[in-house]
Amino acid sequence: MIEFVYPHTQLVAGVDEVGRGPLVGAVVTAAVILDPARPIAGLNDSKKLSEKRRLALCEEIKEKALSWSLGRAEPHEIDELNILHATMLAMQRAVAGLHIAPEYVLIDGNRCPKLPMPAMAVVKGDSRVPEISAASILAKVTRDAEMAALDIVFPQYGFAQHKGYPTAFHLEKLAEYGATEHHRRSFGPVKRALGLAS
């Protein structure tokens, strides 16, 4: 893994996404500028934290960060653009939503969207860079809450459990009930359920 060198600048934003793999719902991104004067203990990749810990950290991040913002790309945008381009768009939206413009942006992964300030992609950034860890927590808590809300409207699909990912249960219910308007029609299993696969 390439050694990561933290940029020498004051206002660094971390950006991460949640929801590239699911068959349903938006891809959600977050951008966070942490306050060096108000450190947050225990930041880590959101997937490595318990739900209870994520929720507590989410509130602490919102309270202590210099600025934070959420971005998203809806299922119809994912279908029109493809998941990679939709994710880049959602990241741009998260950065644009910050009320303080960052001097530098660190993005989780290996690709950067076009941004009006310098940016760098950091592989495994969600466990290496506190700003990206914070962004991953905000994005995951937000998207999980959306899946729980969707589960109330469509209880037969089990969205609260699998968060829209293509589990055996989700695929079984997709075949049984068809797709909701929140499903991503460009994704193979949804296409097949709708009879659109060629």
From Swiss-Prot:
Its EC number is 3.1.26.4. The keyword Transferase does not apply. It is found in: Cytoplasm. GO terms for biological process: DNA replication, removal of RNA primer; mismatch repair. InterPro entries: RNase_HII, RNase_HII/HIII, RNase_HII/HIII_dom, RNaseH-like_sf, RNaseH_sf. One of its GO terms (cellular component) is cytoplasm. One of its GO terms (molecular function) is RNA binding. It is an enzyme of class 3 (hydrolase). PROSITE patterns: RNASE_H_2 (PS51975). CDD domains: RNase_HII_bacteria_HII_like. The keyword GTP-binding does not apply. Belongs to the RNase HII family. This is Ribonuclease HII. It comes from Escherichia fergusonii (strain ATCC 35469 / DSM 13698 / CCUG 18766 / IAM 14443 / JCM 21226 / LMG 7866 / NBRC 102419 / NCTC 12128 / CDC 0568-73).
